[in-house]
């Protein structure tokens, strides 16, 4: 066996042991489940998919649900497939997985989450190696990914974050190969990977133009015409899955949309822009800083601020106000999807008309999005969320500096994924910290690359 083949075997075995071992601790010693609020939607969709092949958010008790486009189909389809293959008894209620952790539904969610986490760790390690990291950096990435409190929590709940993290990490790996190898197969894999991610979370559509730009820039050894053809193939393959699903939605709902929530997301951000303009930037920053002393000081200094008041009675905050209007606009006889799209257009109009206000709000929203990673429960009452966030941000900045200084296209392709997702959420959503969870494997990979260094390979 050749030396490099031996190293590859050791690499694969090491990653498999670290990834599977750490991930499957979720099955035997799961941490405390923290509901995120979307579990019922995904369980309903998965149950109907497994029972009748219909994508619907109707209550589980509904025997003949009407097809809809309320959520992206990726995770419900995967969970339904796992249920069918495993012969799992379908959940009788949306809350069964949480009320009874030993139920078949709950166990299957954890098993699927563990497999996705192990896959994410393995692909993340391969991406780090492709970006120029050595064996130590790759194995360290796998260990950090599977130890991540936020990713482990995502593996426990029926939601799209775990699947999105696996696919996002695959996109980074494929992009690294695509910008350094002129063969068409890596362009095809890049396009397919980038095309599948929006079927789990619509925000990842931003990866399609990002990937097209990368294919135009590298490999530098190719003439411009060759790079244009590669970018065109990538874009075609990346757009195809979303276009197919949107065509399905056009047939069943009458609207060419990816999911029936994009307008709500944009309008919630527009309402947040208005609230920050009224109440100030600093109260928002204080409310979203994960340090209890800072939050208390902010509440004392600005008692009129309502950023943390998720109350459905009374004024509430930007989120409850926007959602109340969203529901009001969708009441029969209105077309709910048309109402959602109308609110989305209204929000985009506000962003353009009040650009400075939007940019000021973006600073606060970007701050909020930094805190995706959780502090380990074992360290309570010590909370390291803030420290970990700054550490991850510094690592990405450091890795970015290495990429620019060395004109390292491999490292640039690796970082393009988390940076594009971060900017998208900072500009267009309220950026709940969990929105950044799918990018955490690459953030931890940036840590190992920043600490261990990345070997330069400018591409061919």
Predicted features, each with a name:
Residues 40-70, 74-77, 81-94, 274-288, ...:
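Extracytosolic helix-loop segments that constitute the early lumenal/periplasmic catalytic or substrate-binding loops
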Residues 51, 258-361:
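Membrane-proximal stem/loop segments at transmembrane-domain junctions that anchor or position
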Residues 37, 109-116, 140-175, 184, ...:
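Multi-pass, polyprenyl lipid-linked donor-dependent membrane glycosyltransferases
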Residues 103-115, 331-415:
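Membrane-interface anchor segments at the N-terminal boundary of transmembrane helices
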Residues 90-103, 121-147, 165-166, 180, ...:
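Transmembrane-helix signature of polytopic, membrane-embedded enzymes
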Residues 73, 77, 88-122, 154, ...:
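Loop-to-helix entry region of an early transmembrane alpha helix in multi-pass inner-membrane enzymes
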Residues 141-146, 186-201, 212, 237-241, ...:
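Membrane-interface alpha helices of multi-pass inner-membrane proteins
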Residues 131, 171-187, 197, 216-221, ...:
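Membrane-interface transmembrane helices that cradle and orient dolichyl/undecaprenyl
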């Amino acid at each position: 066996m050749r030396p490099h083949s031996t190293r590859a075997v050791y690499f694969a075995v090491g990653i498999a042991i670290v990834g599977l071992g750490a991930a499957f601790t979720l099955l035997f010693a799961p941490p405390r489940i923290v509901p995120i609020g979307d579990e019922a939607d995904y369980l309903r969709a998965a149950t109907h998919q497994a029972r009748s092949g219909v994508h619907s958010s109707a209550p589980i008790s509904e025997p003949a649900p009407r097809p809809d486009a309320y959520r992206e189909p990726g995770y419900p389809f995967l969970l339904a497939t796992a249920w069918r293959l495993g012969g799992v008894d379908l959940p009788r209620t949306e809350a069964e997985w949480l009320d009874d952790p030993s139920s078949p539904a709950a166990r299957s969610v954890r098993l699927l989450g563990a497999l996705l986490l192990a896959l994410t760790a393995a692909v993340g390690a391969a991406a780090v190696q492709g970006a120029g990291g050595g064996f130590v950096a790759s194995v360290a990435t796998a260990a950090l990914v599977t130890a991540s409190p936020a990713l482990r929590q995502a593996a426990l709940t029926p939601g799209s974050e775990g699947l999105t993290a696996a696919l996002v990490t695959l996109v980074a790996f494929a992009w690294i190969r695509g910008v350094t190898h002129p063969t068409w197969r890596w362009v095809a894999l890049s396009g397919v990977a980038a095309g599948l991610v929006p079927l789990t979370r619509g925000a990842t559509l931003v990866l399609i133009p990002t990937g097209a730009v990368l294919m135009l820039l590298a490999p530098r050894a190719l003439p411009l015409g060759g790079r244009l053809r590669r970018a065109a193939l990538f874009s075609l393959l990346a757009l195809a899955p979303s276009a197919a699903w949107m065509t399905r939605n056009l047939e069943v709902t009458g609207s060419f949309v990816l999911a029936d929530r994009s307008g709500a997301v944009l309008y919630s951000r527009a309402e947040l822009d208005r609230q920050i303009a009224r109440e100030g930037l600093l109260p928002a920053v204080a409310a979203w800083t994960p340090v209890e002393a800072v939050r208390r000081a902010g509440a004392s200094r600005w008692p009129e601020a309502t950023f943390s008041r998720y109350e459905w009675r009374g004024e509430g905050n930007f989120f409850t106000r926007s959602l109340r209007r969203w529901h009001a606009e969708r009441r029969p006889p209105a077309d709910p999807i048309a109402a959602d799209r109308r609110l989305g257009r209204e929000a985009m109009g506000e962003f353009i008309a009040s650009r400075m206000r939007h940019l000021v709000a973006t600073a606060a929203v970007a701050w909020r999005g930094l805190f995706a990673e959780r502090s380990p429960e074992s360290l309570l009452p010590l909370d390291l969320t803030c420290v970990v966030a700054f550490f991850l941000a510094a690592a990405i900045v450091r890795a970015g500096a290495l990429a620019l200084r060395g004109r390292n296209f491999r490292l640039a392709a690796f970082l393009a994924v988390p940076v594009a997702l971060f900017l998208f959420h900072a500009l267009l959503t309220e950026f709940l910290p969990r929105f950044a969870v799918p990018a955490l494997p690459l953030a931890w990979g940036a840590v190992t690359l920043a600490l261990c260094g990345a070997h330069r390979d400018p591409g061919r």
